[in-house]
């Protein structure tokens, strides 16, 4: 369009128009990576119209900045100085606040890239003011967005997401590639890989359509980093190579060299699984080491010190792989630090430990630990692992969002895996406990997430409740409504984005020591902790009692996972009262056999180590949602399930006074046979209990009626959301009551009983963080949740729940009350009751 305008005779007759067309064309040529043509066009502008000098200087600074040219900052400094002089002289033809806003915005961006964040913030805030005076909402939006990006660079991820979300509201209908890429970077840093990938896809599409090659190269680097975090080196390597080619073609050596770093990281990720002899693998590692060293030298010469350090750590890792054959326990002179290589390795890792970049620090901790392990010092290696995981926990504690807290665990995956191998090889129960508490379900060491009450969030949740229910009904009727489904997706995105902006307390609990756990158990005679964990292809158990602690290696993990899936499938089938008798007999036999085999592989090898009282099962993996009380070796035992030993021990000191004495709310959702009958029977057992049924059982009605520190009993069908537990929920009269609804509610119950749904199911994020409605409720501060881990028949639920409440009133604590009623139900019906007590409760 600009080139056509230049050919039009009217353009050449109007100097101002001619100059503006040339400036616009220069900016476009810069966007597609043709900096030399862009600079020539800007020189032509000054031949036509000298009064456009400030605009030309601003555009020149932008063009030079996008190609990382050292003259970019001087050009912008000169532009801003000229604009300031013109403003003082009140001479502003074509050189007013609009040009000043652009110049300040671009100089602020250059300051960001140089790490001068104070100067970046000052320029960007000034750009907002100038853009408002000039009436340029697009520049106001971009500057406010950049202020969010500065927060990201300062390490304030919730603040960054909040500022970026506020900026996007200034242009609500626009789909902008640059802001999408920046949000992807923040979400990647927070560990929300799928969400970061979605935003990167938007950015890639936008940059490709606009032929914005410099930005496309950056987006490809982010895509490569996401793939690396997902453990997928093939796509990461492809994206990094393409980014390097694009950057090199447009003469941006710095960007091309940084892209090489991502390709080298993909090589490192692929190296442990490469085929070939030991000699060929060693040669492969040495080749990677040479390349990493050369890359580190080039990055250092360019002034990219953090990237150079990352490359140097890759060099150390490759040389260490070559020296040890990839085994952290293989000793070598280099690893022991008795050769020049060993000394260099240690000093490089130590520099990484002091980096301001979390990913670099964690990588350095892995290497420091490997160096100690290779030198035959496992205790010293575990110290590095613990410090790295503590660093990660402090990072997670900055978030006031369960989503971000659990997502960030992905950054500790390599440290956690190394910690598992190391701790297990020591065989020390104390070391294993420290690893468990630091590396798995790290969010259990953080304060309960209680976001403040937010009217806008409440309104969005109400809208989502209605839209979700309408979309569900349309789908069930065979008439899917794409517009409604789009509305549901839009509301979910808005709700999640809002939750990400909350900051955390920053507090991290100290992991429980084995001696402290045993002292606590001594105050509760007969109680045992059975901590199960999974890795290196096997299941493992750590048994802790007041008198002893013992580690036991169990069976193969793959078999356990397969059997766990079979149990869930059989339980779902048996919950259907309409199941024909022959099929019921087959499913019952299958369930009994599988439960027996799970009992043999997981419980019987350690049952002799357990005391004869309650069993506190600690599991955050694929077996967490097993119906533990149904395993033969645990039948009749008082069993509760938590995700950490610290939380299990803390539950021992929960108030003896039951939650029901602080008030009871009983709720019946729609389409639950006998649901209203059940909740009215439950309410009749308790003094002054509140009942919500029929049209009264709405989301708002339930939230308003929750008794503080009391008991909430809900007979309603559930919805399990694998990707985000806070979108799991319970079906009420007006739609789903979401996990997002409960956390910010002013009143939170101490105990929630979910009698008619299978929201006790759980999934796991990379890094060992459990996902599911139960996990979300416990993280919000609910002390105990009684829920089914699979489907349960309405008839069994009614029998079990009325008996459960009777036992509570008789003075039993939740886990004991549930154990007693499960024994009773097994004598009434052969239909299973897969109910579990989650949380710290005996």
Segments the model singles out, each with a brief description of its role:
Residues 38, 72, 120, 160, ...:
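Single-residue signature of alpha-solenoid repeat helices
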Residues 16, 51, 98, 138, ...:
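Residue signature of alpha-solenoid helical repeat architecture, marking inter-repeat boundaries
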Residues 33, 67-68, 115, 155, ...:
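Residue-level detector of the short coil/turn that links helix A to helix B
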Residues 327-350, 359-363, 377-635, 660-665:
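Amphipathic alpha-helical protein-protein interaction segments
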Residues 3-10, 43-48, 78-91, 125-136, ...:
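Amphipathic alpha-helical segments of tetratricopeptide repeats
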Residues 16, 20, 55, 62, ...:
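Residue register of alpha-helical TPR repeats
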Residues 516-578, 582, 586-842:
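Catalytic cores of enzymes
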Residues 22, 29, 64, 104, ...:
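Residue at a conserved register position within TPR or TPR-like alpha-solenoid repeats
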């Amino acid at each position: 369009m600009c080139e056509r305008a230049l050919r039009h005779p009217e353009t050449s007759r109007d100097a101002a128009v001619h100059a503006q067309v040339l400036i616009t064309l220069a900016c476009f040529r810069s966007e597609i990576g043709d900096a030399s043509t862009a600079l020539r066009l800007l020189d032509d502008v000054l031949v036509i119209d000298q009064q456009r000098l400030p605009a030309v200087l601003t555009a020149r600074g932008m063009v030079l900045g996008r190609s990382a040219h050292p003259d970019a900052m001087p050009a912008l400094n000169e532009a801003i100085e000229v604009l300031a002089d013109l403003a003082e002289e009140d001479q502003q033809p074509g050189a007013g606040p609009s040009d000043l806003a652009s110049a300040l915005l671009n100089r602020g961006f250059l300051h960001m890239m140089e790490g001068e964040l104070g100067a970046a913030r000052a320029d960007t805030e000034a750009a907002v003011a100038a853009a408002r005076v000039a009436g340029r909402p697009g520049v106001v939006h971009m500057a406010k967005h950049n202020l969010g990006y500065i927060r990201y660079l300062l390490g304030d991820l919730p603040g960054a997401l909040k500022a970026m979300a506020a900026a996007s509201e200034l242009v609500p209908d626009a789909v902008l590639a640059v802001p999408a890429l920046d949000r992807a970077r923040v979400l990647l840093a927070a560990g929300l890989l799928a969400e970061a990938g979605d935003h990167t896809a938007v950015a890639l599409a936008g940059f490709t359509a606009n032929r914005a090659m410099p930005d496309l190269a950056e987006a490809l680097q982010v895509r490569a980093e996401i793939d690396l975090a997902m453990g997928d080196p093939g796509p990461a390597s492809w994206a990094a190579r393409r980014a390097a080619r694009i950057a090199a073609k447009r003469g941006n050596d710095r960007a091309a060299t940084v892209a090489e770093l991502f390709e080298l990281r993909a090589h490192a990720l692929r190296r442990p699984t490469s085929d070939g002899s030991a000699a060929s693998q060693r040669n492969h590692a040495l080749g990677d080491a040479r390349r990493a060293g050369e890359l580190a030298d080039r990055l250092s010469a360019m002034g990219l010190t953090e990237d150079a350090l990352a490359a140097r750590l890759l060099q150390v890792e490759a040389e260490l792989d070559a020296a040890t054959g990839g085994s952290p326990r293989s000793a070598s002179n280099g690893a022991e630090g008795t050769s020049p290589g060993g000394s260099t390795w240690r000093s490089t890792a130590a520099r990484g430990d002091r980096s301001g970049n979390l990913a670099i620090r964690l990588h350095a901790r892995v290497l420091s630990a490997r160096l100690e392990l290779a030198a035959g010092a496992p205790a010293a290696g575990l110290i590095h692992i613990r410090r790295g995981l503590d660093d990660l926990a402090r990072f997670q504690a900055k978030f006031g969002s369960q989503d971000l807290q659990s997502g960030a665990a992905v950054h500790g995956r390599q440290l956690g895996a190394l910690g598992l191998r190391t701790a297990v090889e020591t065989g020390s129960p104390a070391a294993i406990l420290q690893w468990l508490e630091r590396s798995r379900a790290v969010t259990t060491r953080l304060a309960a997430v209680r976001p403040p009450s937010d009217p806008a969030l409440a309104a969005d949740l109400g809208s989502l409740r209605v839209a979700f229910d309408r979309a569900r009904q349309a789908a069930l009727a065979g008439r899917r409504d794409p517009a409604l489904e789009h509305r549901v997706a839009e509301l979910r995105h808005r709700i999640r984005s809002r939750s990400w902006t909350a900051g955390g307390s920053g507090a991290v609990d100290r992991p429980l020591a084995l001696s402290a756990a045993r002292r606590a158990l001594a105050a509760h005679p007969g109680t045992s902790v059975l901590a199960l964990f999974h890795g290196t292809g096997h299941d493992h158990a750590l048994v802790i009692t007041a008198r002893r602690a013992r580690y036991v290696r169990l069976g193969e993990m793959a078999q356990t996972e397969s059997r766990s899936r079979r149990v869930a499938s059989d339980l779902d089938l048996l919950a259907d009262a309409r199941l024909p008798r022959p099929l019921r007999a087959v499913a019952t036999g299958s369930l009994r056999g599988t439960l027996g085999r799970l009992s043999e592989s997981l419980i019987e090898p350690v049952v002799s180590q357990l005391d004869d009282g309650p069993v506190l099962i600690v599991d955050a993996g694929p077996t967490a949602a097993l119906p533990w009380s149904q395993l033969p070796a645990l039948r009749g035992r008082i069993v509760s399930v938590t995700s950490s030993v610290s939380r299990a021990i803390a539950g021992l000191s929960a108030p003896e006074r039951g939650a029901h004495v602080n008030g009871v709310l009983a709720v019946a959702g729609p389409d639950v046979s006998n649901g209203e009958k059940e909740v009215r029977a439950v309410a009749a057992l308790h003094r002054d209990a509140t009942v919500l049924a029929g049209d009264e059982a709405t989301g708002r009605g339930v939230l308003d009626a929750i008794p503080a520190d009391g008991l909430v009993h809900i007979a309603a069908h559930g919805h399990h959301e694998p990707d985000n537990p806070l979108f799991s929920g319970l079906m009420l009269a007006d739609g789903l009551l979401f996990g997002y609804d409960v956390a910010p509610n002013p009143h939170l119950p101490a105990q929630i009983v979910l009698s008619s749904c299978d929201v006790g199911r759980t999934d796991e994020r990379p890094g060992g963080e459990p996902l599911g409605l139960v996990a979300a409720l416990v993280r919000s501060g609910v002390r105990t949740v009684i829920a089914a881990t699979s489907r349960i028949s309405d008839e069994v639920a009614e029998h079990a729940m009325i008996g459960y409440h009777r036992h509570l009133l008789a003075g039993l604590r939740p886990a004991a009350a549930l154990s007693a009623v499960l024994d009773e139900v097994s004598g009434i019906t052969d239909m299973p009751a897969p109910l579990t007590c989650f949380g710290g409760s005996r």
